[in-house]
Amino acid sequence: MTTVEEDLLLNEPVATEYDGLTAIDEDFLLGAGDVSRKGTQESTDDLLGSSEPFDQEDILDTVPEQTDENEDEAGDDELESEKEELDYDEEEDDEDRRERTSRYTSEKKGSRKDSVEGDENKKENGQDETKRSGIPSLFDKTITNNPMKSGDQPIGVILRIEGEAERVFYPPPSFMEPKLNIVPRLPNGIPLIGVPSSHGRAGFGANYQDQARMAAGGGMAGMPMGWENQVNAFLNNTTKSKSRGRDTRKRRSSSYSSTSSSSDGRSRSRSSSRSDRRRRDDRKRPREDRDRKDYRRDGRRDGRRDDRKRHDDRRRDSYHRDSDKDIKRRKEQSKHSAMESAKALGLSNDYIDQVNEQKRKREEIVRKKEERRHAPVSEKKEVPTTVSTNTSSAAYANSKDKTKAYLAVNVTGVQQLPTAVKKIEAIASELGPIKKCWRSDEDVVSIIFNAHDKAKDFMLKHNGKVLSGLRITVSLEKKFLNLNDVN
């Protein structure tokens, strides 16, 4: 069918008469709802194949005839009024209704063109028949059988058209064929079929031929029965193999033990036979040869002992060398630390030199003692007594010249007091024992206590006090003195 625009429908009068000259139903024009169907002379095959346009002769039979020209004019007037209302309503309709309207109007346009010619022919023949055009539809189809009903009877469809006999349509015979098993297929389309029983392979069990397998070709082999029997057989085989493995291991271990015991017995027998043979040879050999052999054996033993001793001596010497290096390194570190400490305390370089000299002498004395301790006894006896006397006299002379550090208490402000030494000595003796009390300067009297705590207590107790009308000041000072030289 050809499509015609809606404007052609609205501008062209319709020559169709409706019963009672009533208003045109919009649903009738738009194709919605139930539409009365009238019989046609078309066959059902022509109705189903509606893709081709209707012939002019068929449309003449379906279009109603007009009986009166006055009625045509009245219908035209009423159609014009209805067209205005339809135009207003179609502006508000959605896209779906417009499509249906265009489809229906295209069919009506063709029918109206043919209706004019039909009216002229009918007027000539004097036939006055009023019919409403009917459009066959598939809504009249009914299903004879319930598809949900079980059974093998085919499903039929009845097509009812007014004026035509009912026609029943059945599906093709292939639709009712029994369903076949779905054959699995490979991605390339080859079906999977069962492999014959002769395709068994060694190593897959006794019943490998009876197992279900899939292969290319379609179908599936039957599933084997008697799974319990197969499982029991498998378990029996595994237990038998395990017991067989244990037996073989036991036999191997027993064979190993027997072999080891036999080898031990052979070695013992060889050693015993060798020792017996050696004793027999020693009895047969002359005494001189035996003594010479024993001497050689003793010499080798002594040589090994000497080697071990030399090795131990070398190791001991290396240890002593390492220890001497460590001692020297520690001495250097202590010397540097002592110098830094003395500088931090504000001591003079002379004091630091004296301390280092004393340390060096002490180290020298310790070294000589170690040498005498490790020296042989003969060398100790050869040391003359004169050396000892000389060393003792030199030590006595050094002790006279050597000074010692003391913590002295200085009392100042006693220049105008002649008996200041006696008075201060008496006061210090009351506090604790003293080593020395003397006038170190015209205005200073110095005291050395046996204990440093007493010197501190004296300073705290008498500093700033008045002695015989004179205010004295007490302070502490570290002095390097030789008390034998102090008057």
Swiss-Prot record:
Biased amino acid composition, Low complexity: 254-264, 385-395
Composition-biased stretches (Basic residues): 241-253
Superkingdom of the source species: Eukaryota
Ranges of biased composition (kind: Basic and acidic residues): 97-132, 273-338, 358-383
Biased composition (Acidic residues): 54-96
Protein known as: Uncharacterized protein ZK643.5
Species whose genome carries this gene: Caenorhabditis elegans
Organism phylogeny: Eukaryota, Metazoa, Ecdysozoa, Nematoda, Chromadorea
Region annotated Disordered, chain positions: 35-153, 237-345, 358-395
